[in-house]
C-alpha cells in the first residue's frame, strides 16, 4: 500500500514525475527517465501501465483546464532554434500579430524560436497568446509572451491539444518536429479526423523540395491530387491572412465579438 501511495504521488506531482534507474556500486546515478520514455520502453506490469494511463489522463486534464476558454486558435509550428533577427523569426512575429488582429488566439508549442516569435507578435498587438510546452531532458522553458501555458509530459498529448483548439495551421521553417506536426495535421484532415482546416506553409524556398515531394506523391498515386489543395504555400503575410479568413472564418461561422472586458483578453472570435 505504501508503494502504491508513493507511485500515485509521483504521478500527480510533475516535480516528482521523473523516475530514476537504480544506482550502481559507484556514486554515478543514471540519468532520469522522462514520462514518455518510460511509456514507450516496452511492456511493464499492469499496475505500472495503469499509473501511466492516469498520468496521460492528468496531462489531458491540465490541458483542458488551461485552454478551455482561449477561443478559436490558429496554431503556428516552427523551429525552437531560430533567434531574434533571423528572417523566419521576424516573419513569424509579423504573422502572429496578423493572426491576432484577425481575432484568433495564437497557439504555439510555447517554447523559444519560431514559437516565441509568433506569441510575441500576438502580444505586440495586445492579442491573445497561449502555449503547450513539453517536458524535455534539457528543460524547454516557456517563452515570456504567453497569457496561458500548460507544460505536458507526453508529445502525443501536446500534439492533440495543438490541433484540438485550432481552425488553421501555419508552418514556418523547422526541423523534424515541425515536419511531424505538419504531416500530423495533413493526415488528420485527409482522413476526416478533423474538419477541412487549412494548412499554410510559409518559407517557400526552404520548403521547395518538400512541396515537390507532395507533387510527386500525387503523380505516383500515393495521395489524391485534391490533397494538394490542403496546403497553401506563400511568403506573404497578407496572402496568408486572406487565405485564413476565407478558409477558417466564413466556412465555420466564426464571428468577431468585442466584449466590454476586451482589455482582459476576452475579445476575439467565437463560433456561432
Language-model features: where?
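Glycine-rich beta-alpha loop segments
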Residues: 2-33, 37-134, 141
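Solvent-exposed alpha-helices and their adjacent loops that cap or buttress functional pockets
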Residues: 66-69, 98-100, 123, 140-144, ...
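Structural motif
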Residues: 72-75, 104-105, 127-131, 147-150, ...
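Acidic/glycine-enriched connector segments
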Residues: 113-172
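Short gly/pro/ser/thr-enriched loop/turn and capping motifs at secondary-structure boundaries
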Residues: 135-141, 178, 206-209
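Active-site/ligand-binding-proximal alpha/beta "capping" segment
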Residues: 153-205, 251-253
